[in-house]
Structures are given as structure tokens and as C-alpha cells.
Amino acid sequence: RLIARSGHIDLGTVATAKHETHGSLSDAGHRHVHQSAETGTAISAAGDITLAAGGRIRARQSQIDSSAGRTALYGTQGIQLSEGRQTLDLSEATRDKSRGLISSSSRSARYSRQHDEAVGSSIGGREVVLAAGKEGDILVRGSSIISDEATTLTGRNIGIAAAQSRYLDSEFHQTQKSGLTASLSDGVASAGYSKSRQSLQHKADITRLSESQIGSLKGNTTLAAAEQIDTRAATLSA
């Protein structure tokens, strides 16, 4: 049991980051990678799990699960489940050159990746209960609440929404060739110089929704609000 009779319960995250740098961004050949992620709180038990706060309960990218018991969250001033984020920022460029006796060629490529992904919270148990006080709201975003036998959410207002992930990707490829040329036409030989360039570019901007999932595998799913229930891009099942 985790009880804060007059205060709040905040299950936050710890941010981690990883960097990889080769060359300068202005160099024809370079690789820069920055990755970030969050590590949330994990609570697991075979029996009952209870979190009770006289204030609010906030859980970000948290996993709370009872394998055979009841998981209950009581927040007098409200309960909020939300997603954490993991990101990727990559810039990479390569260039290859080759030279022969009368010709030369070069191939270059540039890659860019900017990813911002949602990683939701999850709550599970044989039975799951989320209960807010008369003046408290329940907000669930990009997260899942799944029980084996019964799932119940009660509060003043209940809001269930999706979290967004965005992926920006671009690639650019270019091939250049140059060199001397020779031809024979009607017995006349001629020589010259030629230069060619071919380019290919691809860009993608993709937004994906991570739906919230509220349900029970074998029993009932109950949402009871004194005022309003608002669901957007959510899956409710029983």
C-alpha cells in the first residue's frame, strides 16, 4: 500500500540520453545521433495493490500490475495516467569517390530522422478500480487499463484520449559522373567531355496515435461520471 492522506502521489520518470558524434554536421561524411528515453515507475505484486491520496495521483509511463489481486487507485482530487516520450534525432551523410584514367564518379547520401514516440502507462490486475473524489477527474492518455475480471472508473469527469507519435524522415541520394567520351560516325572520330548528375529525394511526415485501452478480459467494464465522459481515439472493451 502507498498512502498519502493529505498529499499527492506522483509516479514520475527519470530521463536518460545517449549521444554519438562522428565529424561535423557540415562534413560530407558525418554521423550524429541523439537518443532520449524515460524510465517510469514499476509496481508489481501477487496480491492487492492500493494507492490512495488525499490529493491527486499522477502516473507517467508507469506500470502497475497485480498478477492475482486487486489494483486500486484512489485520488480525492483526481487521477491522471499519461505517456512518457522516447526520441531519436539522427543526421548522417556519406560520400564515395572513384577515379579512372578518363572518368570519375561520386556518390553521396544524406539521411535525417526525427522521431518522437509515446510510451504509455499500464494498469492491470484481477480487478482494477480507479476512483476520484466528488471534485476529482480521471484523465487517461495513451495508456491502458486492463483487468482479468472487472474494470471500474468513477469520478466527476472521465476523459480518455490517445497520445501522438511523430516521425519525420528524409533521404537524399546523388550520383555524379564525368569524363572523356569518344565516338565514330561515318568514319569520323570525335572526342568530347560529358558530365551527368542524378538525384533522388524522399521525405515522410507520419503521425500515429497510441490509443488508450480500457477493458476487462472476462468481466464488466464500468465508467461512471457525475458529469461527463469524453473518449477520443480510445478502445473500450468488456
Stretch-by-stretch model annotation:
Residues 1-238:
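Binding/recognition "hotspot" determinant
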